[in-house]
Structures are given as structure tokens and as C-alpha cells.
A protein has these predicted regions:
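Catalytic machinery of carbohydrate-active enzymes
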Residues: 2-227
Length: 227
């Protein structure tokens, strides 16, 4: 999937001793190139999904999910082994305010760890689940990327799917912890990386419901605009 947005990809396991002019640590690239927040390239989408896969998932979702006016994809759990996971992932129950939205269908994009929380969901709207073998045959993120194409909005924690949605220019609400990763900066609700993304920030460590309430209010206004 990510090869569609670059001219070439060299795996880190390859030993490359010639054929390049410069070498630079990835974390230093922005500084070396003189890139700052105001000039970060944000021409999205910069990765492409095969049309046949997009069409396949349009048909599949039509069979798996009932008709809906608006579909909202949900992700709440990142990698539990991440050193900051306790500050960026949140319980699924925190998203209960989303049930206040009219004419929406909630769809879980949570696969593997964290997906078991759907069984304990007590919200007034059901959460529809997708097959757990997604991406296993088509390649990492391929099916997921095609599915995002058929959702109106994505609500997600700070995990890999947030970056996938942003790179695909999908409308996204990112729920951030009190002290987020450096790339999300501070004191702003947008991001120079992904122009279709809205940032909703936690005001107090560990308190996620108010973040979901703010996300819900934002979505209500955007969905109202599309009526």
C-alpha cells in the first residue's frame, strides 16, 4: 500500500553501500531540509487503493452492514505494548456519546486486541463488526484502506489507523491524550500533516468521556452540514 506513494522502497534489512549521495537519520530529515510546521507538505491523498479492492469492499459492506445514512468507523485501542499506550488508548465505553448522533451507523475497525470490548458495549446504538481476517490475504492495511473509502467519518485513538486515514484524506476525528506525541503539536485542533483531520484534546489525564462529547458535537455539526 505505502509503495504507491513513493518512487522506491529499500527495506532496512538491505545493506546499501553505494548508489546514494547522502545519508541522514530519519528523525533529522525535516531539520536538514528546513521544513517547519507552516510548510509541511499536505497534498493528500498520497497513497492509492486499487480500484478493484475498493469495489470489492463496497459489495462486501453492502452484504455485511444494513443500509445507513452515515457510517462512522471506530478505533480505540492501539498497540498495548507501546510505552505510552495508557495515555493514548481509551475504553470503547468512552465513545458512548456518539450514540446521540442521528442516522449514523457505528462500525468497529478494531482488529485483534481491544476488539473483545465490543462484546461488553452498552451503548444505545449497536456497533457492527467486520471479519477479523481483514488484511491477511491482501497485505497489511490494504483491506482496511479500501474499507475507509466507504465510511463517512473515522473516530480514532492515536494509532496507525489515524495516519492511514489522514494519508487517504478521509474525514477523521483524532482523540488525543493530555500529553500527545510531538507530531500533533499543542493548542490547535488541526494538523499540518493531514488537512482532513480534526484533533480533539484531552483536558485531564485519564478522562476520555469529555473528549468523546466534544468529538460528538463536532460530528453533529459536520453531519448536519451534509443533510
Amino acid at each position: 500500500l505505502f509503495r504507491s506513494g513513493i518512487s522506491s522502497l529499500i527495506p532496512s534489512t538491505w545493506k546499501v553501500e553505494e548508489g546514494f549521495d547522502y545519508h541522514c537519520s530519519l528523525i533529522d530529515v525535516a531539520d536538514v531540509l528546513g521544513i517547519h510546521a507552516d510548510i509541511i507538505p499536505s497534498d493528500v491523498p498520497y497513497i492509492r487503493i486499487p480500484e478493484n479492492l475498493v469495489g470489492y469492499w463496497k459489495r462486501q459492506l453492502g452484504q455485511i452492514l444494513p443500509p445507513a445514512k452515515h457510517r462512522i468507523g471506530l478505533v480505540w485501542q492501539g498497540n498495548p505494548d507501546h510505552q505510552a499506550d495508557m495515555f493514548r488508548s481509551f475504553p470503547l465505553d468512552s465513545l458512548e456519546p456518539l450514540c446521540e448522533l442521528d442516522d449514523v451507523q457505528l462500525v468497529s475497525l478494531q482488529f485483534g486486541r481491544g476488539s473483545e470490548q465490543v462484546q461488553r458495549w452498552k451503548g444505545s446504538k449497536p456497533i457492527y463488526t467486520l471479519p477479523q481476517d481483514i488484511d491477511r490475504s491482501s497485505g497489511a492495511f490494504m483491506d482496511t484502506a479500501a474499507i475507509l473509502h466507504h465510511l463517512d467519518w473515522i473516530v480514532t485513538s492515536d494509532t496507525s489507523l489515524a495516519h492511514l486515514a489522514g494519508a487517504l484524506a478521509r474525514p477523521t476525528v483524532l482523540m488525543l491524550g493530555f500529553t500527545p506525541d510531538w507530531r500533533w503539536l499543542l493548542d490547535r485542533d488541526d494538523t499540518p500533516w493531514y488537512p482532513t483531520m480534526r484533533l480533539v484534546r484531552q483536558k485531564r489525564i485519564g478522562e476520555w468521556r469529555s473528549v468523546a462529547e466534544e468529538a460528538t458535537a463536532f460530528l453533529a455539526s459536520k453531519l448536519g452540514e451534509s443533510q
